From Swiss-Prot:
It comes from the Bacteria. It is found in: Cytoplasm; Secreted; Cell surface. Its EC number is 4.2.1.11. HAMAP family: Enolase. It comes from Rhizobium etli (strain ATCC 51251 / DSM 11541 / JCM 21823 / NBRC 15573 / CFN 42). One of its GO terms (cellular component) is phosphopyruvate hydratase complex. This is Enolase. One of its GO terms (molecular function) is phosphopyruvate hydratase activity. SUPFAM superfamilies: Enolase C-terminal domain-like, Enolase N-terminal domain-like. The active site is at E204, K336. The keyword Cytoplasm applies.
């Protein structure tokens, strides 16, 4: 009754107005699952390939080739197979593609089908997606890492680092965490405006003021947390996503906004100093994706005190994660479904991290849609943390709203991760 009977893929637009792939998978019993694929602005060199058409249409960013692959070649390969056989279906698509980075069919085609299959199977089973994927133990609501100041590739301003986040660990529920985040977000808007800064928002819904340094951004956030009635370092902690690969040039870190250039060791020391000065408990991509020595230096300096998240470093790839674990590099992995391109491989990356006592953070991309699948996956995997942007833009809020619904559905079984995510 759960055999796949049809796949209908289409080209839709993401939150940046760029094309992306959406897939509907239909089953024999009438069940249907729909998934839309996100897209990143700052992408790791080792990510699975997002297939684009080239040419004049959509300035080369069309996805008709990926849509065609899903509708024809992929459907021909998996049509008739039970949707409950997720691993088999994903492996068939990976083998059908035949490349190490999914560049022939496109990770956007494969992922769209993979997620839609899981959602169709969940509907057929009468279970919410988080329960279908995660089983009876899926009950941990993640701490949101809310990106309220944007810089780097996500905004048109001088700030070198890409994201400045708040983590409301002092909340008792995800609903309360969202409220706390919203209050700080709106307080920050007033603080920025009062100082003459613009309050335009970036790709992920955070403000993109013309600040020149990380310290200036962090000072604004700390002040806003306090003015909103919360205690920095108790109710709310801070997090950074440096996206350091974006400003790593000729073996050095070029902080143009701050007017300085740092060697790897000095960059690690700078980040450790920021973490000591401010209530920072998480730094993502503090070093560049292939600067393994720099990552080791940063881990040795700060790895026992704070969470060091590998995004471009690991690209949700279990093989690269195992390399990092073996080398004692970082202590956490950022999990982006489109970096690896299938649900099975995504879950494998989370399991690999947890077995090595690394944390895992479920994450959106800067180019998103109204699809809220990652909210369910964060609960399904008991990650305990989720990155899905700021407290504005419907493409970001869709995930927060879904987490609130999941918490409501879990009732007394629901647990909010809260302070359990803090290291040291």
């Amino acid at each position: 009754m759960t055999a796949i009977t049809d796949i209908i893929a289409r080209e839709i637009l993401d939150s940046r107005g760029n094309p992306t792939v959406e897939v509907d998978v239909y089953l024999e019993d009438g069940s249907m699952g729909r998934a839309a694929v996100p897209s990143g602005a700052s992408t790791g060199a080792h990510e699975a390939v997002e297939l684009r058409d080239g040419g004049k249409r959509y300035l080369g960013k069309g996805v008709e080739k990926a849509v065609e692959a899903a509708n024809t070649e992929i459907f021909d390969a998996i049509g008739g197979i039970d949707a409950e056989n997720q691993i088999q279906i994903d492996n068939i698509m990976i083998e059908l593609d035949g490349t190490p980075n999914k560049s022939r069919l496109g990770a956007n085609a494969i992922l769209g089908v993979s997620l839609a299959v899981a959602k169709a199977a969940a509907q057929a089973s009468g279970l919410p997606l988080y329960r279908y994927v995660g089983g009876a133990s899926a009950s941990l609501l993640p701490v949101p890492m809310m990106n309220i100041i944007n810089g780097g590739a996500h905004a048109d301003n001088p700030i070198d680092f890409q994201e400045f986040m708040i983590l409301p660990v002092g909340a008792d529920t995800i609903a309360e965490a969202v409220r706390m985040g919203s209050e700080v977000f709106h307080t920050l808007r007033k603080e920025l405006a009062a100082q003459g800064h613009n309050t335009n928002v970036g790709d992920e819904g955070g403000f993109a003021p013309g600040l020149k340094s990380a310290s200036e951004a962090l000072d604004f956030i700390v002040k806003s947390v306090e003015k909103a009635g919360y205690k920095p370092g108790e109710d709310i902690y801070l997090g950074l996503d440096c996206a350091s690969t974006e400003f790593f040039k000729d073996g050095k870190y070029v902080l143009e906004g701050e007017g300085r250039t740092l060697e790897s060791g000095a960059m690690a020391e700078y980040l450790a100093e920021l973490a000591a000065k401010y209530p920072i408990i998480s730094i993502e991509d503090g070093m560049a994706e292939d600067d393994w020595d720099g990552w080791k230096a940063l881990t040795d300096l700060a790895g026992k005190k704070i969470q060091l998240v590998g995004d471009d470093l690991f690209v949700t790839n279990s093989a690269r994660l195992r390399d990092g674990i073996r080398m004692g590099v970082a202590n956490s992995i950022l999990v982006k479904v489109n970096q690896i391109g299938s649900l099975t491989e995504t879950l494998d990356a989370v399991n690999t991290a947890h077995k090595a006592a690394y944390t895992a953070v479920m994450s959106h991309r800067s180019g998103e849609t109204e699809d809220s699948t990652i909210a369910d996956l964060a609960v399904a995997t008991n990650c305990g943390q989720i990155k899905t942007g700021s407290l504005s833009r419907s493409d970001r809020l869709a995930k927060y709203n879904q987490l609130i619904r999941i918490e409501e559905g879990l009732g007394p079984q629901a647990q909010y991760a809260g302070r359990s995510i803090i290291r040291g």
